[in-house]
Amino acid sequence: MRSKSVVVLDYGSGNLWSVQRALQRVGAAVEVTADSAAGAAADGLLVPGVGAFEACMAGLRKIAGERTIAERIVAGRPVLGVCVGMQILFARGVEFGVETTGCRQWPGVVTRLDAPVVPHMGWNVVDSASGSALFKGLDAGVRFYFVHSYAAQRWEGSSKALLTWATHQVPFLAAVEEGPLVATQFHPEKSGDAGATLLSNWLGEL
């Protein structure tokens, strides 16, 4: 049986090579590229992201990545967003008083965590959604690795979406699963065995 093909979208942001290695370790055939045709053709598309929402959206638009994501979703083809790659899937992001339009796959806004200590950095427990395909086989109270100052702190989308929450003084969305579009605020590639299981689960859905 052939390995599932995954494109890690290279738009100038994200831990590209650590994501690539993590996917390869669970059996994926991985290509890191900015090429939209490759992104459209792969079994799965992973959208990484670190840094500022505005800069990530600018980089994504330079390579027509926003369109690639949208076309895959319309066609029912899997997309996984990680960290800021999750945040930019929402309609808006607000950083330092500046509002930036996101990919608008989900309604809502990404804002600075309303917590006394940011960034939120380190291991944290997640409360995974019942029936989640991403978290299949993982125990309750499983920990993942986070590095972020911003997050979606409420959900305004479909009631059919599966929502996984975490708390850093305040609750925020740690993962969302809605049809072919899934995303994690944490870094599965930095989350050891739990992250490997999650990535393997995603590959199994491709």
From Swiss-Prot:
Molecular function per GO: glutaminase activity; imidazoleglycerol-phosphate synthase activity; lyase activity
Pathway info: Amino-acid biosynthesis; L-histidine biosynthesis; L-histidine from 5-phospho-alpha-D-ribose 1-diphosphate: step 5/9
Database matches in InterPro entries: Class_I_gatase-like, GATASE, Imidazole-glycPsynth_HisH
UniProt GO BP: L-histidine biosynthetic process
Gene3D superfamilies in alphabetical order: 3.40.50.880
Subunit structure: Heterodimer of HisH and HisF.
Stated role: IGPS catalyzes the conversion of PRFAR and glutamine to IGP, AICAR and glutamate. The HisH subunit catalyzes the hydrolysis of glutamine to glutamate and ammonia as part of the synthesis of IGP and AICAR. The resulting ammonia molecule is channeled to the active site of HisF.
This protein's name: Imidazole glycerol phosphate synthase subunit HisH
Organism: Mycobacterium leprae (strain TN)
